[in-house]
């Protein structure tokens, strides 16, 4: 099993994070791409770095979006090499 290509940083109680999770889950399921979700409240360094920007998505380890996830843009990032 390969590493997840998409990482979603968020925290509990964040409604934008819940919206982002639904989009990421749908796009990744459609494309057969793995993804993971990380709660930034469990890591002080991540909280410092991303606390004001969540939800933050990374594609292949690079920051892709923050605050909102654009499904078309995410799909494009995952299908272009």
Sequence positions of predicted segments:
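Thiol-/selenol-based redox modules, centered on thioredoxin-like
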Residues: 73-81
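A short, hydrophobic beta-strand/beta-hairpin element that forms part of a small beta-sheet core
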Residues: 55-63
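Thiol-based oxidoreductase modules, predominantly thioredoxin-like and allied folds used
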Residues: 33-44
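Long, contiguous secondary-structure blocks with strong helical propensity
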Residues: 2-5, 31-33, 80
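Local sequence-structure signature of Cys/Sec-based thiol-disulfide redox active-site neighborhoods
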Residues: 1-27
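Short Fe-S-cluster ligation motifs
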Residues: 42-55
């Amino acid at each position: 099993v390969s590493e997840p290509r998409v990482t979603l940083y968020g925290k509990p109680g964040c409604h934008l994070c819940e919206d982002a999770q639904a989009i990421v889950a749908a796009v990744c399921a459609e494309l057969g791409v793995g993804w993971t979700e990380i709660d930034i409240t469990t890591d002080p360094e991540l909280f410092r770095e991303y606390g004001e920007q969540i939800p933050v998505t990374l594609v292949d380890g690079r920051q892709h979006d923050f605050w909102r996830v654009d499904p078309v843009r995410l799909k494009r990032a995952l299908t272009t090499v």
